[in-house]
Amino acid sequence: MKRILATIALLVFATGAFACTSVIITGKATKDGRPLIWKNTDGGEHFCSQRITYNELGKYAWAGLALDGTPQSAWFGANEKGFVIMNTSSSNFFTGKKKSNGVIMKRALDVCVTLQDFVNLLDTVSLPKINVASHYGVIDAEGGAAYIEVKYLSSTKKLEYWVYDVNDPALAPDGYMIYTNWSRNGKEDMGGGYIRYDSATKIFADGYKTKEFTPKWIIDNLSRSYYNDLMGVDYRAMVDAGLYKGKGFIPDSDFIPRITTYAATVVQGVKKGENPLLTTGWTALGYAPTSVMIPFWVAGGMDGLNKVVRGNDNNHNDLNIGENNAIICDLSLKLKTQVFSVIRGHGPNYLNFSKLYNAEGTGYIQQLAPVEKEVYDMTTAQLEKWREKGKIDKKELAALNDRIYAIVMAAPVYHNDYTYKYGKIGKKGESNE
């Protein structure tokens, strides 16, 4: 009996790698008519630094989630033409080899303008060392929006793919589509992310009723959600209702944010006819429940990226930021080590929820909420002015970045004395699926 229970426990609490969750929302489902594309990025490591980088070595410049200025792969990005791409890894397309999903995205950001350009790329890409098992999400400045399931066929050495148009009411009647890690064309009931898919479906359905969809709403309600649809349990709601009576620790089981989470990113596209350089990214690097959403644009180049999300120029020894790591990411991960503080045995399968959210209002999510609100409100007000002008003013962007930097660096929760439980935060994380 003990063996059976132990086996069940391992199955319940096992943490899967590459457990990404995503959505594409067309303009018909948002209040302002602009599309949104979101990905909660997970990988194989528990604690690794991520950053936003700028790349101008291809046909088109782009900014996004990649590890350096000359990356071979990208994991989420937007280019100067308003082409935006992300992916979630497929775990029921069986390839048997290391995946090259990010290589395709980097190539797409370099050369694509439209969704059709990306489809054409899949037809023509050279494949000597590329292996793909992925769901690519794409939006463009012309209103294109689709998921494309892609797998590599070793028998033909070509890519096989299926396009799911989010503008098609037969496929997405409410104007949005969700993907996790199982493919509609993969092996049935295999793969992962079914519970996260159901949780996201419930949350988005509730938001759709009043067209609540904004970048901030998505990060708050999805990337900081502790709702498990299979169990019918929402830990944040339980705390708010005074119903949570636990000791603080809960299983880190099938939530959208998890110990393997690297970042949460939303990109807001443009309406037809708008300047594609107004395409706006928002990223909560590290672990979204302990991070702050920071905006980014392609228009300002590398200097236009906020200092807290790009590679760190100055080693902030007072805050123990790793050399060339993104400041906000390492600050977030320092708090994350306090959430996942039990490292012996199966301890990493549990998180200290009371550190994140509690009845006293002192959880990390609660302390960072006013910081993020100030950043978000300030940015959206400036963005509206740029939309009226039809372009981003680089001097105003620099001033905005300075204000955001000051707000984030002044957050008291980031200035407490924390001890790393897992050693120094590293720079790994190339497999952000």
Explain the meaning of each model-derived region.
Residues I4-F13:
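Sec-dependent N-terminal signal peptides
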Residues L11, L122-S126, G207, S225:
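Alpha-helix boundary/capping residues
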Residues F13-A19:
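Sec/Tat signal peptide C-region and signal peptidase I cleavage site
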Residues T21-S22, G27-P71, G77, F83, ...:
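C-terminal, well-structured catalytic/ligand-binding subdomain of enzymes
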